[in-house]
């Protein structure tokens, strides 16, 4: 009988934990079978591929809770258990399983604990000489207000006991913080609230890497197209980064290597960073598969979950991927990924899919709480075209002419100017409500004023309904009431008008429209290639 290994899946799908983890579990099963192991899958979701009867050698359809998992282990007597592919759910079982004599394959439970525990992790960051945004933990309302004042607004607040960014909020002033503490969470000694300095106007990055404890291979450095503060699962992302310098990307890769070695990671690691004024800050480290693993694997042509599984059962990266190390040692690696050759000039853009149409009352706005339920991908040699393809796949057909409606929060007004002028050059009519209109007019943009919903009719929502507005850029003001902005966004969803709620997404749209217009002027259309062709381009 072959050696047995148990893989724990991610349990039921929910917003924040979806099918991406199932992808990693299935690849882990295939990898074990390639190495001659008997793969035992434990999961409880009928919607997944890992629970197909012919995927693993044996399937247990059981909840991912300690008692059930322990019963299976006692019955199967495996060599060990792999936890790192099921997201956060199985990770919580690491210490209880180890205490009961179960061998955890891959990253040790102590290392998982060090990455998950805020105090231990802060000590590690200081020890490695890295930077982290200032933060604090509050157990009373008074303590929360005191910490927020010391750190300085805006702050990111969240309960310490939730996953998937639920109940997280960016708070811009004391009044808003009081409201959040009264309405959204109950702060107490048992349920503390975590408060972090929110790095306004920063760029967020995600890194997926594989480590064997000595060597670390960077799968990809991904740049979020939305600003920091939008949940990583809701942001469009680009491989390689499209607006960061090579030096920053190399620094991020180096910091990821340090963290993976210090945490003695054996398998996958995901690190999230924010870059503000050319300074790199570590936001969080997950010593497990992240939801970007399928996207990265398809972008680089290497199955990260398969590689990580081979590492978890004791193989070294140099054994598994000699050709990648050869390329690295010759200095021939792509700047944002150790796996890709230097000449690989391809952009992959991931865009997310939202269920807004199924929930007519939900405000379709992005924030630290995850709301997306799927994702698509666009690949091309230019960032603009890759982004255009991703929008098309997500169901947004970007207009090449027509009218653009702009309404932004005061803090975004200086950034809107260049964007409005560029759209004007492309032949778009610019419409705006009073505040934004006044600002644009004063700075030489030929904008037209349109009424807010509260100012009477015909207003901006009427224009959207009548098909007179073809694109909307509307950033939130920080307040959550059902404002004019809410009705604008809902009308866009209802009438299929592409709308964007962050400035960086607005600039990415501009880049996409410029690229597609240029392509058409040259008499060409979008090129379509299979992934197999792309790896050989």
From Swiss-Prot:
Record region (Allosteric domain): 396-537
This enzyme's EC code(s): 6.3.4.16, 6.3.5.5
Span of domain ATP-grasp: 122-313
Record GO biological process: 'de novo' UMP biosynthetic process; L-arginine biosynthetic process
Span of domain MGS-like: 396-537
Annotated Mn(2+) 2 binding sites: 284, 286
GO molecular function, one term: carbamoyl-phosphate synthase (ammonia) activity
Gene3D superfamilies noted in UniProt: 3.40.50.20, ATP-grasp fold, B domain (3.30.470.20), Methylglyoxal synthase-like domain (3.40.50.1380)
Pathway: Amino-acid biosynthesis; L-arginine biosynthesis; carbamoyl phosphate from bicarbonate: step 1/1; Pyrimidine metabolism; UMP biosynthesis via de novo pathway; (S)-dihydroorotate from bicarbonate: step 1/3
Domain notes: Corresponds to the C-terminal section. The large subunit is composed of 2 ATP-grasp domains that are involved in binding the 2 ATP molecules needed for carbamoyl phosphate synthesis. The N-terminal ATP-grasp domain (referred to as the carboxyphosphate synthetic component) catalyzes the ATP-dependent phosphorylation of hydrogencarbonate to carboxyphosphate and the subsequent nucleophilic attack by ammonia to form a carbamate intermediate.
Official protein name in the record: Carbamoyl phosphate synthase large chain, C-terminal section
Names of required cofactors: Mg(2+); Mn(2+)
Binding-site residues for Mg(2+) 1, renumbered to this chain: 272, 284
Region (Carbamoyl phosphate synthetic domain) location: 1-395
Organism: Aquifex aeolicus (strain VF5)
Record note on cofactor: Binds 2 Mg(2+) or Mn(2+) ions per subunit.
Keywords assigned: Amino-acid biosynthesis, Arginine biosynthesis, ATP-binding, Ligase, Magnesium, Manganese, Metal-binding, Nucleotide-binding, Pyrimidine biosynthesis
Domain of life according to the entry: Bacteria
Positions of Mn(2+) 1 binding: 272, 284
CDD domains: MGS_CPS_II
